Amino acid sequence: MVNPLYQKHIISINDLSREDLELALNVAASLKAKPQPELLKHKVIASCFFEASTRTRLSFETAMHRLGASVVGFADSNNTSLGKKGETLADTISVISQYVDAIVMRHPQEGASRLATEFSGGIPVLNAGDGANQHPTQTLLDLFTIQETQGRLNNINIAMVGDLKYGRTVHSLTQALAKFEGNRFYFIAPDALAMPDYILSMLKEKNIAYSLHNSIDEVVGELDILYMTRVQKERLDPSEYINIKSQFVLRAADLDNARPNLKVLHPLPRVDEITIDVDTTPYAYYFQQAGNGIYARQALLALVLNRELVL
């Protein structure tokens, strides 16, 4: 098939239409069911991580290898000319784009991935997270997991818990689910980490139902998806972190009144916000969710690097 994502930058979930998302999810499902180990043979992909990452980097690089691509890059920008010699991000991307067919990039600065597209010479840039801004590939794997567990992406009751201010995953996921009908959002966070106003305004403009809550207990019986997040220590003042981190913790007993179809998701890493007794409940799905990252990222790589895709 001829696909609309060929040679397209994947920077924000807003860059993708509902049809784009559905296409990528279908490709991810196909690749999970039937591996394609030579789909990106002879392609070279740069894995450029200017910020620490475990799951995103490893799943992206696993996705690249399992599609047959060659991988170059770095996991620590301090060992690059940018980190050691003061080279600009623009120059770094301009050079890397001469070597590769696509660039996967994580950076602590909001907007860095969008900036990189201006200097990539048309080479597709895939945002693997830019500060507290966007994390579109995490969003795609979240959508894939919701569809896998619920059989749909519409009429979903979803609660998002914890750090809704700095947590880029919840921003992107809310924007993505807003493209599908009938979804209902429950936001559970301390005032200091509440969902940003621009997200709430977007939901209001689209007449999408949402509500703000102080505890998981208030809504657990209504939910299809419970999306937990950690309080991000690296983005908070130490005293503020200590005061906030233990306010919203999920324990197995909190799920006593849950619907049978409920799944607990988490972008990981977790710290204290999900106790280990939740791991053995039928509701826990966060490790399978992480595994789905391979297929979601394979799908995007396959689409941006193949004009016609036959699976």
UniProtKB/Swiss-Prot annotation:
Its EC number is 2.1.3.2. PANTHER family: ASPARTATE CARBAMOYLTRANSFERASE, ORNITHINE CARBAMOYLTRANSFERASE, MITOCHONDRIAL. One of its GO terms (biological process) is amino acid metabolic process. It is an enzyme of class 2 (transferase). HAMAP family: Asp_carb_tr. It comes from Pectobacterium atrosepticum (strain SCRI 1043 / ATCC BAA-672) (Erwinia carotovora subsp. atroseptica). Heterododecamer (2C3:3R2) of six catalytic PyrB chains organized as two trimers (C3), and six regulatory PyrI chains organized as three dimers (R2). Carbamoyl phosphate binds at residues 55-56, 106, 135, 138, 268-269. Keywords: Pyrimidine biosynthesis, Transferase. It catalyses: carbamoyl phosphate + L-aspartate = N-carbamoyl-L-aspartate + phosphate + H(+). One of its GO terms (cellular component) is cytosol. Belongs to the aspartate/ornithine carbamoyltransferase superfamily. ATCase family. It holds the Pfam family OTCace. The keyword Ribonucleoprotein does not apply. The keyword Transmembrane does not apply. Pathway: Pyrimidine metabolism; UMP biosynthesis via de novo pathway; (S)-dihydroorotate from bicarbonate: step 2/3. Catalyzes the condensation of carbamoyl phosphate and aspartate to form carbamoyl aspartate and inorganic phosphate, the committed step in the de novo pyrimidine nucleotide biosynthesis pathway. Gene3D superfamilies: Aspartate/ornithine carbamoyltransferase. L-aspartate binds at residues 85, 168, 230. This is Aspartate carbamoyltransferase catalytic subunit. GO terms for molecular function: amino acid binding; aspartate carbamoyltransferase activity.
